Amino acid sequence: MADDVIDWLPYVDTLDQRYLNEVEKTVTAELAAIEQQELHPRIAELFPAVRHHWDEQYGLYKDNVVGLEGSNKRAAEDGVLSELKRRCPGIDISVYNDDSEDPVLLATIAGYRYHQDLVVTQLLPQTLENQWAINNAYLEGAEAAVRRQLQEQEQQIAQLDRHRQELQQREALRFRYLERQWRDRLHGNLERAAGNI
């Protein structure tokens, strides 16, 4: 059946159900064979990839630790942690020594801690709420854009189907005439061929 040529006009012709079943089966098999690891490129444009600042560290962890068990895993984790601390030493805590008697250093420590307290108790909740609202608004806008595009495409498909239907119905008489003419010539050729035998 793979070599059969099917010439079919859906709004004029009738088609045997077995052909439709075969087409559905083939389409299902082809769709199952397609790997869809990514979103459609137009969707990916709306949602650009965000690189997390821990991606590199996680890659190091994944390369060295994942798959290990027991003491081997613990030793590998310690090695990864040492490497990360070497690469990214963080804040030097020795600068903020509470045991110091130096009033300037103690004032610096107090200011730093007060700043941390303000950030955690007042600024962070406001910022998170604003970030949440901004992200929600962005996602709603992106979703609306995708829905609009989908609706436009569905309308275009429906319009194209209506055009095809009108065209096929308008030309149905010509198709029947051409088919009848083809059959008559075929019969005539067969009769002539049979008469020559």
Swiss-Prot record:
A biological process from GO: RNA splicing
UniProt keyword Magnesium present: no
InterPro entries: SPF27
Statement: the UniProt record of this protein carries the keyword Nucleus: yes
Keywords: mRNA processing, mRNA splicing, Nucleus, Spliceosome
Pfam name, any one: BCAS2
Entry superkingdom: Eukaryota
GO cellular component, one term: spliceosomal complex
Subcellular location as annotated: Nucleus
Quaternary data: Associated with the spliceosome.
Primary role: Involved in pre-mRNA splicing.
Protein name per UniProt: Pre-mRNA-splicing factor SNT309
Taxon lineage: Eukaryota, Fungi, Dikarya, Ascomycota, Saccharomycotina
